[in-house]
Amino acid sequence: EVLKLKNVQDIYMTINPELLAEMDLLDMQKGKYSHPKYCIKMATGTGKTWVMHALLIWQYLNAKNEETISGDYSKNFLFVAPGLIVYERLLDAYIGKVQENGQRDVETSDLKMFEDIFIPDPYRDEIFNFIQSAICTKEEIGRKTTGTGLLAITNWHLLVGEQETEDEISPLEDPTIAVKKEFPIRPGTSAGHTLNVLDNQYFKGKQLDFLANLKDIIVFNDEAHHLGEWQKADQILEKKWQKALSHIQKDKKNKFIQVDFSATPYNETGSGLKRQIHYFPHIITNFELKEAIKLGLVKTVAIDKRKELAALPLDFKVEREGNDIKSLSDGQRVMLRAGWSKLKILEEGFLNFDKNKHPKMLVVCEDTNVVPYVTQFLKQEGLSDDEIMEIHSNKKGEVKPDEWNEIKRRLFNLDKHKNPKVIISVLMLKEGFDVNNICVVVPLRASSSSTLLEQLIGRGLRLMWREPEFTEIKDENREKLLIKKEEPDNYLDILSVVEHPRFIEFYD
């Protein structure tokens, strides 16, 4: 807007041309970098959604009120999420949280609750009228008639015509996959092909074309590290999410502005000592997790260094016979006991401050088949059915829509209820799980991916003790942990990660 940048290379040429010597110039000539494109690197829990709000309001009010059309602003906005939880979180932000009656209450939306922060008095009616008329859920894109702009929220699967629940199954495992690809479907309720279903399938492609035909648009990609390239043999390939964005951008040039948000905007190649991190070239700001911890914007992370963990092998996978799971490994049992022990200490300690604050433990398994074994073990340790919540997902960490509705119901106001105490998941809760009371994380996995580790920690970073009367206590906690290297007097807004000591290097 100020520098009149037209593409990613312009950022370097305008601010620091010398940096181009360190960049892959051929890569920067790709179409996905040929328009205004920016990446905001922010630690989880530090307000990425709020930055989106501010950018949207600034853009919309300028586009609506500028005397001479400059082409620098837009009234069309597309928010793209990597999955159902982040998608629901974005809907919460703009049209309010789902209440126990199943309806959304706009009074609980971010913009309504914090209107004093985001919107000057003279413009409030303008902004709220725009949101009410322009908002489109993923099912409404291209169907709903909006006012003078668009505020569309979707997951990337819709843009590429995929169901989010499709497993990665080969045609050899299920021949009907090949049949569906080769033969057209016909209406018939017995096969599940009602006219409504066929209509929805038809509109999947239409929604992408509708967005492509807009004269201008601003796209906000949440958890945008999923946009990174992937390597197959000696080929570097674009992911489907990026291909869909390129289709929308194709004829817009600099009338297409892309803003990516992620705590981990990079690709990883290699493994072990050969692991390399390749940061996205369009990162323009970096707010690190360690800075957020120092400022008290998120919980302080503490690694549980237990001698019994250090003595165990590093591989924390379940014990198997072929492909069949035999049992949890000794290391996994030790970690679960350590996590449960820590949670009980927190429950007792928190009673001294507020009996209505209930700490939770998040267990992340290597795959969904391990979840029942974790549940069985925790029951043997004394937990009841009500104290445990399982979230099952497919091979890609995704949940079927009908199951997601039940999960969403149980997740509603999870912070306010004593039970469940333990949430067991695979990848589903990796992103967008905005629960404040996760105080213990037990990662039962062998992967040491930097991206995965930071995303897992992110599930427990959101502050639980936000009230002003606890500020001084939390300041003392951070000083003892971070500076004096001492045990704190209490565990207010401290996230305990039960981890093998050899993984600590990644957290450092």
Say what each PLM segment does.
Residues 1-508:
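RecA-like P-loop NTPase motor core of helicase/translocase proteins
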